[in-house]
C-alpha cells in the first residue's frame, strides 16, 4: 500500500475512513509515535484522496462528493508484459480469482467441496469431514494448498491480492520465480494445515501467505547485509496489531466475519522461518 497522508493522533479519522469504505476504497490507518498514516491501494488516485481529505477537514460534507478511485498509472503497470515477468504472482492472482468466482464467494458448495482442505458433509448443524490421513491416502494432494485460493467476500479477496501483487511481486522480481514459488508453497501448506488442525476444513483465504510474505520481507531486510525490500517499520507493527485484533474477536464483532487466526499466525511464523532458511541455505 501507499502512504497518502499523515496527521496527528488528535485527528479523528473515523468519519473519513467510513466514507472511504462506503466507496469501496481499500485503505489502512497505522499509528507510529504521535502521528497516524493513511495508506491506500496503488490503484487509488492519491491526489484525489488528499483533495477529499482537505475538503472534509475544511468542513465539507462528504455525502455531496464523488470519489474517483482509479489511478491510470497503476492500470498501465498491470500490463501483460509485467504479468509475464511475474508468472508466479500472476498464477496466484489468477487461481484466486478463478476459484473464488467458481465457489461464488462461498455460496456454491458443490464447487467449494473440491477445494476445501478435506472433503466434508454438512448434516443439520453438524459438519463431518475426512481426516488428514484419509485425504493423503486418496491422493488429493492439491487440497493442501487449494483453500488459500477461496475467498468469501470482495473486500477480503481484493486486499489479499493487492498484498500479493505488491509484496509477493517484489519478492519474485528481486529474488526469482522459484524462490517466491517455494515461499508460497511452504507458507500456504503450513497455514492451511494449522488452520485445519484447529477448526476443520471450512476456511479459506490467502491471508496466511500474505502474513508470510510480510514477515519474510521484514526479517530478510534485518538479517541481510543490505536491505532489499525497505518496507516501512510501521507495516510490521500494523501486521502484529491486526493479528492481535483477530484473536481478540474485535474483527468478528464489527462484522468482518470469522477470521482464520491460526492461518495468519502460522503464515507469519512460516514466513519468518523461510527467511532464516533462505539466508542459511541460500534457497
Descriptions of predicted regions:
Residues 2, 9-23, 28-51, 55-57, ...:
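A detector for small-residue-rich transmembrane helices and their helix-helix packing motifs
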Amino acid at each position: 500500500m501507499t502512504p497518502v497522508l499523515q496527521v496527528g493522533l488528535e485527528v479523528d479519522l473515523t468519519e473519513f475512513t467510513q466514507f472511504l469504505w462506503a466507496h469501496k476504497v481499500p485503505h489502512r490507518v497505522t499509528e507510529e509515535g504521535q502521528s497516524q498514516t493513511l495508506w491506500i491501494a496503488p490503484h487509488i488516485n492519491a491526489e484525489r484522496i488528499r483533495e477529499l481529505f482537505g475538503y472534509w477537514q475544511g468542513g465539507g460534507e462528504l455525502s455531496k462528493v464523488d470519489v474517483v478511485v482509479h489511478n491510470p498509472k497503476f492500470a498501465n503497470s498491470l500490463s501483460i508484459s509485467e504479468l509475464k515477468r511475474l508468472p508466479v504472482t500472476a498464477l496466484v492472482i489468477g487461481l484466486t480469482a478463478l476459484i473464488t468466482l467458481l465457489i461464488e464467494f462461498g455460496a456454491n458448495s458443490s464447487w467449494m467441496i473440491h477445494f476445501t482442505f478435506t472433503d466434508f458433509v454438512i448434516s443439520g448443524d453438524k459438519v463431518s469431514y475426512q481426516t488428514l490421513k484419509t485425504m493423503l491416502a486418496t491422493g488429493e494432494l492439491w487440497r493442501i494448498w487449494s483453500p488459500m485460493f477461496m475467498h468469501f467476500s470482495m473486500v477480503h479477496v481484493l486486499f489479499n491480492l493487492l498484498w500479493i501483487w505488491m509484496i509477493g511481486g517484489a519478492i519474485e522480481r528481486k529474488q526469482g520465480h522459484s524462490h517466491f514459488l517455494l515461499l508460497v508453497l511452504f507458507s500456504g501448506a503450513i497455514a492451511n494445515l494449522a488452520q485445519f488442525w484447529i477448526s476443520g476444513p471450512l476456511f479459506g483465504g490467502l491471508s496466511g501467505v500474505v502474513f508470510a510474505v510480510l514477515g519474510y520481507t521484514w526479517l530478510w531486510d534485518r538479517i541481510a547485509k543490505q536491505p532489499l525490500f525497505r518496507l516501512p517499520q510501521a507495516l510490521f507493527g500494523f501486521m502484529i496489531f491486526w493479528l492481535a485484533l483477530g484473536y481478540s474477536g474485535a474483527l468478528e464483532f464489527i462484522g468482518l466475519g470469522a477470521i482464520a487466526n491460526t492461518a495468519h499466525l502460522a503464515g507469519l511464523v512460516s514466513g519468518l522461518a523461510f527467511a532464516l532458511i533462505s539466508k542459511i541455505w541460500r534457497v
